[in-house]
Amino acid sequence: MSESSSDSDSSCGWTVINHEGSDIEIVNSATASDNCGLTLECSLVEQEELPVLYVGHGGEESSANNTSSVGETMLSSMRETKSAAEVEEAPSPEDNVYFGTTSDDSDIVTLEPPKLEEMGNQEVTIQEAPSSDDLNMGSSSSSQYAFCQPEPVFSSQPSDEESSSDDTSHEPSPAPRRRRNRKKTVSISESEEPPLAEPEDEPSKEPSKRHFSRGLNKCVILALVIAVSMGFGHFYGTIQIQKQLVRKTHEDELDGVKGYLSQRKQEQESFLDFKSLKENLERCWTVTESEKITFETQKKNLAAENQYLRISLEKEEQALSSLQEELRQLREQIRLLEDKGTSTQLVRENQVLKQYLEVEKQKTDSFLREREMLLEEARMLKRDLEREQLTAMALRAELEQFIPGQAQSRAESPSVQTEEKEVGLLQQRLAELEQKLIFEQQRSDLWERLYVEAKDQHGKQETDGRKRGSRGSHRAKSKSKETFLGTVKETFDAMKNSTKEFVRHHKEKIKQAKEAVKENLKKFSDSVKSTFRHFKDTTKNIFDEKGSKRFRAPKEAATEKTRTAYSYSSYSQQEAPNQNQNCRRPSAQRDGGREKPSHSEEIRKNANSYTYKAKSDCRGTHSTRRVCSGMFECAGQEAISPVNKASPVRMNDFKQLIHWYLLNELETFHHWKELDQFISPFFPNGVFRHDQQLFADFVDDVKGYLKSIKEYRVEDGNLEKLDGCIYRHFGHVFALPFGPRSVYIKPCYYNSF
């Protein structure tokens, strides 16, 4: 393209931007004189031209070929203005940049923009100067141009010969920037030479140029229309290419995101695997640590056990060595005796000693049997004594109960003084009975203490006799035969004498205590019976004289129940030897009769049987057949003191107590169903029925049923304590007013009452 075309481009204010490659060319506009010398044809072209034009590769080549002839005519009109501008200014090669000129250092071509005062009146025109086929607008076939308005900036004075290599200028200039290839930069100096040589022929060709300029304008317009259409087509193709590029970039980005996600997933899986591996390692570490600790503890235990075994082995070795030494000595003694020879005297002495030993064994066996019998008899005496104590307490409680009723009737009764005397006598009698009971208790405690002391002394004597006998035998081996026999005889004589004395003393004490207890029990039972009958008759007379309906029913019930208790005690006198043969046989053989112990036992059972809390409990529990009219009647049914209070006996509690006792005493019991079938009829609705049978009789029946089972007929009497355990659990534990019992009495007998 020529200089004129470059001037027209710069004057029209177009900026050309090439989108291909990385090289940029900046084209500055020409001087103000070039802008003023535009022709009329250029102004016509400006009116019809678009503000922005995108020109493709094919459009560029066609427009350049069509407008090459038009550029030649335009040069003539441009020379005069250009020459005047060249005269006014002396341009330097650094001030102006020729269109299409490049340098080896840069691909930027800069054209100086117009001045600010001329920018307002300036219009946009495009002219294409003639150029050779090899120039092709100084761009590659794939170049794309964008034309836009230049930015108004201050610039220095431009020159036509300014080099395109002026990259270092710091002045801003609104010049069209075009990207082009380096290889296709062509110098303009050759194309500028012909127009510089033609100014001499312009005056002669001026009329023809005008006519030609009109046709040229039409051609230019046609070329511009073609170029615009081609530019729009190229722009549409560019948009499609851009869309494809955007789609492709999106696909690439999507592929990259997918790859990144897959990579992150793999990393996460590897991290999870690492985490699980770490947990497994920690678990294995803890297991190994625990195993290590257990191994260390086992090692310590084994070391301690080894040490203990070593010590015990040393002790056993020492004992074995001592036994071996003793065995060696015995063998030596046997050898010495064999050397001396056995004589008939030694054989006789041995026979005599054997006879003594047999006699003493028989005596000790008889003593042991007699001791067991005495112990059993002592237990029976203790039980009888305790029964009498309970009977006295029951009588005292009944007396205290009837005292308020007597006090109320004293005001109405004429025999107040006689009753007071009788009450005083009864109180004195009770005091005497209490004193007798205390005396008997002290005597029984003393007897038991003496018996235990004698037993301990006898045991010590037996152990001493054995030690002396063993020592005497050892001495006899070392000493002469006479010394050995003498020591053995002395030992046996001492044991015999001590045993005889102990047995004699013990028998005397037992006889004395037994006789005293019998007498006291007889006197006590007689006095209690007489006192109770007298008291009963007195109270009966009092209530008969009073004639009160309120006191008549309890009085009759009390007399009836007391008579029933005594009649039942007479019946139990016949049944007691059969039911209690195991525990009372020794004393029965000695005494011959069991009337008083059986009577006292029945009183104890009735006194320790289950009682009731209050009148409401009695009425609520016994609502069938025989209903309790009051607390006195309920107490009379069980033959106990009316001051005792308790809850109804429930079947679950009774079964639990029986199960607990049998498991503790017998350890194994396999007849639970039979026992439940035996117990259940006495507990309708889960509560014991007193109108069917007394609770004491029921306990005796259960005890007899358990004894009747063949598997549990044990000689040690495990079932003898069953009734005491039941009474202790369900009955009232009386606080005995006679002080603490002896320390030698078993807790079961003490706590059961």
UniProtKB/Swiss-Prot annotation:
<keyword id="KW-0131">Cell cycle</keyword>
<feature type="compositionally biased region" description="Basic and acidic residues">
    <location>
        <begin position="457"/>
        <end position="467"/>
    </location>
</feature>
<protein>
    <recommendedName>
        <fullName>Cell cycle progression protein 1</fullName>
    </recommendedName>
</protein>
<feature type="compositionally biased region" description="Basic and acidic residues">
    <location>
        <begin position="553"/>
        <end position="563"/>
    </location>
</feature>
<feature type="compositionally biased region" description="Basic residues">
    <location>
        <begin position="468"/>
        <end position="478"/>
    </location>
</feature>
<feature type="compositionally biased region" description="Acidic residues">
    <location>
        <begin position="190"/>
        <end position="201"/>
    </location>
</feature>
<feature type="compositionally biased region" description="Polar residues">
    <location>
        <begin position="62"/>
        <end position="78"/>
    </location>
</feature>
<keyword id="KW-0812">Transmembrane</keyword>
<feature type="coiled-coil region">
    <location>
        <begin position="298"/>
        <end position="449"/>
    </location>
</feature>
<feature type="transmembrane region" description="Helical; Signal-anchor for type II membrane protein">
    <location>
        <begin position="219"/>
        <end position="239"/>
    </location>
</feature>
<comment type="similarity">
    <text>Belongs to the CCPG1 family.</text>
</comment>
<dbReference type="GO" id="GO:0016020">
    <property type="term" value="C:membrane"/>
</dbReference>
<feature type="region of interest" description="Disordered">
    <location>
        <begin position="553"/>
        <end position="606"/>
    </location>
</feature>
<keyword id="KW-0735">Signal-anchor</keyword>
<dbReference type="InterPro" id="IPR051990">
    <property type="entry name" value="CCPG1/PBIP1"/>
</dbReference>
<feature type="region of interest" description="Disordered">
    <location>
        <begin position="457"/>
        <end position="484"/>
    </location>
</feature>
<feature type="region of interest" description="Disordered">
    <location>
        <begin position="57"/>
        <end position="211"/>
    </location>
</feature>
<comment type="function">
    <text>Acts as an assembly platform for Rho protein signaling complexes. Limits guanine nucleotide exchange activity of MCF2L toward RHOA, which results in an inhibition of both its transcriptional activation ability and its transforming activity. Does not inhibit activity of MCF2L toward CDC42, or activity of MCF2 toward either RHOA or CDC42. May be involved in cell cycle regulation.</text>
</comment>
<feature type="compositionally biased region" description="Basic residues">
    <location>
        <begin position="176"/>
        <end position="185"/>
    </location>
</feature>
<keyword id="KW-0472">Membrane</keyword>
<dbReference type="GO" id="GO:0045787">
    <property type="term" value="P:positive regulation of cell cycle"/>
</dbReference>
<feature type="compositionally biased region" description="Polar residues">
    <location>
        <begin position="573"/>
        <end position="584"/>
    </location>
</feature>
<feature type="compositionally biased region" description="Basic and acidic residues">
    <location>
        <begin position="591"/>
        <end position="605"/>
    </location>
</feature>
<dbReference type="GO" id="GO:0008284">
    <property type="term" value="P:positive regulation of cell population proliferation"/>
</dbReference>
<dbReference type="GO" id="GO:0045944">
    <property type="term" value="P:positive regulation of transcription by RNA polymerase II"/>
</dbReference>
<feature type="topological domain" description="Lumenal">
    <location>
        <begin position="240"/>
        <end position="753"/>
    </location>
</feature>
<keyword id="KW-1133">Transmembrane helix</keyword>
<keyword id="KW-0597">Phosphoprotein</keyword>
<feature type="region of interest" description="Interaction with MCF2L and SRC">
    <location>
        <begin position="1"/>
        <end position="307"/>
    </location>
</feature>
<feature type="topological domain" description="Cytoplasmic">
    <location>
        <begin position="1"/>
        <end position="218"/>
    </location>
</feature>
<comment type="subunit">
    <text>Interacts with MCF2L. May interact with MCF2, ARHGEF1, BCR, VAV1 and FGD1, but not with TIAM1. Interacts with GTP-bound CDC42 and SRC.</text>
</comment>
<feature type="modified residue" description="Phosphoserine">
    <location>
        <position position="187"/>
    </location>
</feature>
<feature type="coiled-coil region">
    <location>
        <begin position="503"/>
        <end position="529"/>
    </location>
</feature>
<keyword id="KW-0175">Coiled coil</keyword>
<feature type="compositionally biased region" description="Polar residues">
    <location>
        <begin position="122"/>
        <end position="138"/>
    </location>
</feature>
